Every structure is written in C-alpha cells, then in structure tokens.
C-alpha cells in the first residue's frame, strides 16, 4: 500500500510553492511514467506499507538505490513482478522542523537513476519472484 498525493483525495500542503508542486507532479506523473511506465501515481512518496510476501518475493540484491529513487525502484520492481500496488490518498504536510535535502545535485542524481532502474529491471516478470522461505517450509 502506498500513500499517494496524486490520487483522488490526495493533496499537498498549501505552503508548498507552485515550483515545488510542479516539480513533484512532473517527476511522478510525467518523467517516471515515461521512463518506467509505472502505473503507481506517487512513486517518490515515503508512506508505504509492505506485505510480507511481496518483500520476500523481491530479490533484495537487485535493489541498488537509496534516497528518493529507492521509493520509485521498489514500486517499479513490485509492479514488474506482478504484485498489486494499492494507493490510498494522503495529505502531504509541510515539515515542521529541519531542512529539505532536495538540492539540485540530488534532483539531477535522481533523474539519472530512474534510467538505471529501468535498465536494471526492464526484463523482470512475475516468474522472477523469489519463493518466500516461509512458503518453502510449508511445501
């Protein structure tokens, strides 16, 4: 399950400037979609709840990303392996403390890493799921 800012009922804090809103929307709904063809509406949001069997079905050695792109890579791999991604609307509130880590360098790195994710996982299919240890014991 993914908490999404970009499904019906989802929203962003009114304190976000239009530039930040546009960058986030464009990254999720245009750029990532064009490269990965991911059906997930909010690939970069951090509100996630994972089913144990989905996590066990992903070969974690394949996941190379960290930071913002980690969220997109996990959503993409989940979709490529044929698992369902369920999105629920969330309100994304402005932080009360601290500073954003989203520098220009991080934006460029994230944009380039989307291509790496596409290249690394484009051939994944449901048959590539790992057999969960918990299910191996039951058989």
Regions found by a protein language model. Give the residues of each.
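Acceptor/aglycone-binding surface of glycosyltransferases and processive sugar-polymer synthases
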Residues: 1-68, 95-108
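Hydrophobic alpha-helical segments
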Residues: 18, 23, 65, 85-87, ...
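Generic recognition of well-ordered alpha-helical segments
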Residues: 29, 77, 110-114
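Short, hydrophobic alpha-helical packing/hinge segments within bilobed ligand-binding/sensory domains
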Residues: 46, 74-75
């Amino acid at each position: 399950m993914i908490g999404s800012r970009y499904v019906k009922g989802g929203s962003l804090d009114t304190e976000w400037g239009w530039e930040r809103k546009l960058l986030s929307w464009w990254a999720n709904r245009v750029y990532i979609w064009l490269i990965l063809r991911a059906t997930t509406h909010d690939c970069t949001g951090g509100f996630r709840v994972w089913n144990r069997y989905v996590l066990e079905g992903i070969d974690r050695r394949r996941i190379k990303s960290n930071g913002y792109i980690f969220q997109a890579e996990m959503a993409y791999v989940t979709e490529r392996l044929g698992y369902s991604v369920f999105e629920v609307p969330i309100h994304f509130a402005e932080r009360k403390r601290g500073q954003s880590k989203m520098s220009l360098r991080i934006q460029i790195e994230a944009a380039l890493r989307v291509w790496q994710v596409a290249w690394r996982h484009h051939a994944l299919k449901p048959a590539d799921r790992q057999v969960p240890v918990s299910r191996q014991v039951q058989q």
